[in-house]
Amino acid sequence: MAAGRQTHCTAFKGARCIAAGELGDVALKAKAAVDKGAQVMIFDDATSESIEVDFRGSAEDVLQRLAQPDGNPAVTEGPRGPGRPKLGVVAREITLLPRHWDWLSAQPGGASVALRKLVEEARRANGGKDRVRQSQEAAYRFMSVMAGNRPGFEEATRALFAGHRDRFDQLIAPWPKDVRHHARKLAADALDAQPRATGLLKS
């Protein structure tokens, strides 16, 4: 995936974490390892998608390429009417049925305002569920790459999606420390949504 220099990420050399933070800083530390012949993987902290970095050339070359990643077109501003605020909106195409467009157009402020309100309402209503889902997906994606062949992976995956925190921690305990810690960090929202079972039956 393409990412900007300020994307937060984590780099692994084998099972060892060698850098974490903004992509610009992480890329430089990863380049030092790559220049010595190491194989390095960089993961987006939000999604665990692998970030591809071109390490050729000098450190300045690497940072310059990160400043304008492929697939990130520059945003150009069109003229605004007098007094119209700069909202930082992005134009993209969406497809709806005619009746949907009719309803949106009839709303106060028009289709764009109505869509933004609907999105914000949905985000507020589903914020907790979305965080759990995103946490599950990010943790699973990372675990599949870094621990897919390790003992307990399948069981740990089931515990992750079931929200069984203690079971998850128990199953990943034999994994390398850095892999274990990062998986637990990614899974935090998914697992912390469920109450801890340990000790609940004690009087």
Where on the chain are the PLM-derived regions?
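Short Lys/Arg-rich basic patches
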Residues: 68-95
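Short, charge-rich amphipathic alpha-helical segments embedded
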Residues: 172-195
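A short, exposed loop/beta-hairpin motif centered on an aromatic-Gly-Thr core
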Residues: 14-22
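Short, positively charged interaction helices/loops
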Residues: 125-158
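Short amphipathic alpha-helical segments
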Residues: 94-96, 104-123
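Short, mixed-charge low-complexity intrinsically disordered segments
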Residues: 37-67
